[in-house]
Amino acid sequence: MRCSLTSMRTIERTTAFKRDFKREAKGPHRAVLDTDLRQIITALANDQPLEPRHRDHALSSNWKGYRDCHVRPDLVLIYRIDEDRLMLARLGSHSELDL
């Protein structure tokens, strides 16, 4: 019997995302970061739609090909989805990410 998780995308994190995560884990979002971000990443990796409150949308200009969604109202995740991969690119506020 096959597990339904076999269709889950591989999750990759850029060096910038890892640095951003460490910074945010020490900041005001530390209490909810793990659970809120985990829910979003799980949904994206399994091709499930995000709740409207996350305001998921495509980016343009320097970030063409990427999307962003709000983990919290002032915390944004920038990511890219390929056929078999979810690339977590950046995590931070709009001002930190120059959005």
Where are these regions (language model features)?
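Basic, Lys/Arg-enriched alpha-helical interface segments
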Residues: M1-P73, I81-M87, S95-L99
